């Protein structure tokens, strides 16, 4: 309730403070009320609660927010220096710096922090974009790349152009670093808000927040180990399904890419198994415009895209970087090789919709369409595409319940008539997580979600029956004047033991805040 200023009165909260102060303090932490410093509720509580424990609590909240101010100043200053860049130009510079992650001495980024930073920078840019940034045609595309990308990767560019681009890259590096620092510190605030082991204090020379025990950390690590074991389980099932299908005895694609293509097929089968058995999806996906596409083709396209970007972009770039030791030179050689072979090997790729469909079509071969299906390819492109103009409008309107897609969740980005991709995302993204979050986070309001959840409940019920349980699915206790218990997903009984199960089938969460909301 504390997310909304008009959901509860300050008087009621003050009454709660007098009887259960710890409960109210946890409610403030869970709701992050203290981040809304101008909230009438927050101001009323601060004015009325003057006891020592409350003053320490308010002081800790202030200290946590004060730490964000230097980062916000750096971010604001860097954005001001870069505001003359169009959306396309900013993305071009981001794509250059993104390749630093593929250097041999680059630190591991297992949590995807780099993508979080780039995602936030792009979303903030989308909130400030003029409409003309989305009216992209061939002329404007060429002019922008000539002024802002060519001088970086081709050394024969003029000195003035190169100096201007170097200055833009330097300011963007400042923006990236400051945004990274802010996101890191937001993790500390989430720790304070959602970790039941987190305690706080205001003592000179001591940390403001600390853990009473390591139970929360150990629980998080244990969950990670479970996730790793489940990954191996589903991959093992997919390998067996791949062998049973007869594909293991066939050449897939060119001989040099055969092993990578095999792995792509196995991963697609793994994802299909999980989506069907855990998330209740069928063999075909219905899109919002009524078109349908095979789920396997949707998943296979993303896996083969990763193979393509890894083999044609990342590996050659790393070879060139080892030779020259200079990021720009390596990117220039990669781009030049592409031009000599008639291919786009720039740090980001783009083409019009028909060209994208033509390339994807070959991945939709089936008995029904032995040469592939253009309609299926178009549906796949639609499924994986984020329309940045529409997203900009959504962000400006601040529509509740409409989450913005993350970079990897919809890795085709529509600007004007062009579809863009980032090889530095596509080559290393987790395509299963991308598919799940596309379906269950970005498109959580799909009409099919309820039917999918019912399939999960029925499949789980059947599995339990095979193990000797008596199972009732979807039981609704009678509604009384005093109470409405709602639906009980599964009631299971065996050997005198009764289990009441609530089936939850959401998206893949990556932060303590998201996990807490799920619970």
Model-derived features with residue positions:
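Acidic, metal-dependent phosphodiester-chemistry machinery of nucleic-acid enzymes
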Residues: 1-451, 458, 462, 466
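Residue-level detector of functional hotspots within protein domains
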Residues: 455, 476, 489
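A short acidic/basic microdomain associated with nuclease active sites
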Residues: 462-483
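Anion-binding and metal-coordination hotspots
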Residues: 483-486, 503-505
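Short acidic loop-to-beta-strand element that houses the catalytic metal-binding Asp/Glu
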Residues: 485-493
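Active-site beta-strand-loop-beta-strand hairpin of nuclease catalytic cores
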Residues: 492-510
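Short acidic, glycine/proline-rich loop/turn micro-motifs
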Residues: 511-516
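Nucleic-acid nuclease catalytic cores
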Residues: 519
């Amino acid at each position: 309730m504390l997310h909304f200023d008009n959901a509860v009165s300050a008087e009621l909260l003050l009454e709660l403070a007098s009887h259960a102060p710890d409960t109210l303090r946890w409610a403030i932490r869970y709701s992050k009320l203290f981040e809304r410093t101008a909230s009438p509720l927050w101001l009323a509580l601060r004015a009325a609660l003057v006891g020592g424990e409350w003053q320490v609590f308010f002081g800790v909240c202030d200290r946590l927010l004060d730490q964000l101010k230097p980062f916000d100043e750096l971010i604001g200053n860097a954005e001001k220096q870069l505001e003359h860049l169009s959306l396309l130009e900013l993305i071009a510079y981001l794509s250059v710096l993104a390749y630093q992650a593929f250097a041999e001495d680059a630190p591991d980024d297992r949590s995807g922090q780099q993508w979080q930073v780039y995602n936030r920078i792009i979303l903030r840019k989308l909130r400030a974009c003029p409409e003309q940034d989305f009216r992209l045609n061939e002329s404007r595309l060429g002019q922008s790349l000539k002024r802002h990308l060519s001088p970086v990767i081709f050394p024969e560019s003029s000195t003035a152009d190169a100096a201007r681009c170097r200055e833009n890259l330097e300011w963007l590096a400042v923006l990236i670093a400051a945004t990274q620092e802010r996101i890191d510190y937001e993790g500390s605030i989430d720790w304070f808000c959602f970790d039941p082991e987190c305690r706080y204090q205001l003592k000179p020379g001591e940390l403001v927040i600390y853990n009473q025990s390591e139970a929360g950390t150990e629980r998080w690590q244990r969950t990670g180990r479970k996730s790793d074991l489940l990954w191996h389980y589903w991959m093992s099932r997919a390998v067996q399904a791949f062998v049973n299908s007869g594909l293991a005895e066939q050449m897939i694609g060119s001989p040099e890419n055969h092993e990578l293509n095999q792995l792509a097929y196995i991963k697609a089968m793994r994802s299909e198994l999980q989506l069907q058995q855990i998330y209740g999806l069928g063999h075909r996906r219905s899109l919002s415009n009524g078109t349908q596409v095979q789920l396997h083709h949707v998943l296979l396209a993303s896996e083969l895209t990763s193979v393509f970007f890894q083999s044609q972009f990342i590996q050659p770039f790393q070879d060139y970087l080892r030779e020259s030791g200079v990021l720009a030179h390596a990117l220039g050689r990669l781009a030049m090789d592409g031009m000599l072979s008639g291919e786009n090997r720039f740090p980001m790729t783009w083409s019009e919709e028909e060209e994208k469909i033509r390339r994807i079509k070959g991945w939709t071969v089936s008995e029904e369409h032995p040469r592939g299906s253009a309609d299926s390819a178009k549906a796949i492109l639609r499924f994986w595409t984020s329309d940045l103009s529409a997203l900009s409008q959504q962000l400006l309107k601040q529509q509740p319940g409409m989450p913005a897609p993350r970079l990897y969740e919809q890795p085709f980005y529509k600007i004007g008539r062009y579809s863009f991709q980032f090889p530095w995302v596509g080559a290393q993204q987790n395509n299963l997580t991308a598919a799940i979050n596309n379906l269950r986070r970005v498109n959580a309001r799909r009409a099919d979600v309820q039917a999918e959840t019912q399939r999960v409940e029925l499949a789980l019920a059947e599995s339990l029956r095979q193990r000797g349980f008596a199972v009732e699915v979807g039981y609704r206790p009678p509604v009384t004047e005093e109470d409405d218990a709602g639906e009980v997903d599964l009631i299971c009984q065996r050997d005198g033991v009764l289990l009441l199960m609530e089936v939850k089938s959401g998206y893949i969460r990556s932060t303590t805040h998201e996990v807490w909301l799920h619970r």
